[in-house]
């Protein structure tokens, strides 16, 4: 049982864990979890904001790197877990989900130091209130987004995500920009690691 806070943090009698996937290797920014922002490492900035959220009874950093675990282990109110190597953050969270006893999991990216706790709380409440299998927020596309490889774009149809991309492979009136938060029922993300990868990988 990884619960480290209390039932006080439950929402509508549902237990919610926050899993923060982080790794040192990155195509675009090597070692970014340890990059300092005003003197404090990025991954710790993410943790700071996760602790401000109202509904997380467990906060876990999931990483394949011992240096990240060693840093996080010095912090209070969270734990760290060493995972295997994974292609995506969702696969890393899926591995951890198998050992969690909770109703929902929020995937908060380890490179989101400006994550807004109020936005996160809203997503959690929306997902629980609507009994959603998964919630993936997005924003409208702005000028320059389609050419920026750091911006993940999504094609949506009737509220369902069809396709994610970093290059303008498909640009339609239904193209929007992904916001890097994922909220899902535990059993949904737990099964994710068992799914076959398709030829479409962003």
Each PLM stretch: what is its role?
Residues 1-9:
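Short, Lys/Arg-enriched N-terminal segments with co-localized hydrophobic residues
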Residues 56, 102, 130-132:
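Short, high-confidence coil segments that cap the C-terminus of an alpha-helix
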